[in-house]
Every structure is written in C-alpha cells, then in structure tokens.
C-alpha cells in the first residue's frame, strides 16, 4: 500500500490479530489525544474517521465489508463528515460524493456482505448484515445527502 505503515500483532497462535495501519498521506484529518492502557496516542477524530471510511469504501480495488459495516455504525451515531479529508482526495461536492457512495453500495452483491465480518460478529448481527445493512446504510446516506443544500 502507498502512504501506509502497517503491522500486525498476535498474542497467541489461533487468536485474532490486532492490525494497525498508519496512513502517512496528508489528509487534513483532525486528531485527538487518547489514552489506551495508559499509553497516550493520537487518534483520528470521529468526523475524520467517517470521512476516511467513506474514502476507503469508494477507493479500494475490491469491496471490503467492514467498510460498509463501519460506515453504517458511524452514520447511526450521527457523526459529521470531515470535508478536509474528502477535499484531500479531490472530492468537491459532499452531496455528489454521498450519492456516489449510494450507487456503489447498491451494486454490492448480497453474497459478499459477510466476507471478513462473519467471524467477528454474533448471529444477531449476521442476520442484520444479511438482511438490512445495505438498505439501512443507503437510507442514512440519502438522508445525509438530502439535508445538504
């Protein structure tokens, strides 16, 4: 990957790994100081996280279901979208970009929605992902686009 420092941490064989990706591209993202297990670290602000997730969803060569899952979560939390991040990726109109996200999601085959997510979520969430995730996310994006002048 370009502009990315990546490493993976595994505590035990067979257990989930922690993957850490650090984007070194200048994106205009805003960061906040957080403490995790007593270790201070800079973490992208909510608005920057949502903008970054939208960019990831639309820029990847292949669909990654966690992008859709995370986008849905962020939208349900009513987080704002950091336009500085989108502008760094040459996005000129938020409304048009959200509409492009809707089109992309509409074209995702239903049979790939659980890929990469199935082992991370419980049965109730799997049912939600299979039956509602796409339509709910599309609805939330359309509502967000509709309130933009």
Task: Describe these PLM feature segments.
Residues 1-149:
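Structured mid-to-C-terminal alpha-helical surface segments
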């Amino acid at each position: 990957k370009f502009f990315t420092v990546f490493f993976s941490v595994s505590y035990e064989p067979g257990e989930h790994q922690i993957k850490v990706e650090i984007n070194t591209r200048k994106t205009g993202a805003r960061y906040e100081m957080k403490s995790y297990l007593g270790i201070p670290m800079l973490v992208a602000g909510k608005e920057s996280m949502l903008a970054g997730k939208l960019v990831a969803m639309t820029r990847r060569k292949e669909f990654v279901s966690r992008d859709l899952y995370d986008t849905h979560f962020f939208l349900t939390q009513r987080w704002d979208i950091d336009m500085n991040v989108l502008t760094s990726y040459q996005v000129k109109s938020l409304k048009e970009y959200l509409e492009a996200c809707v089109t992309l999601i509409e074209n995702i085959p239903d049979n790939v929605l659980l890929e990469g997510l199935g082992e991370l979520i419980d049965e109730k969430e799997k049912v939600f992902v299979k039956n509602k995730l796409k339509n709910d996310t599309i609805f939330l994006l359309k509502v967000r686009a509709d309130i933009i002048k």
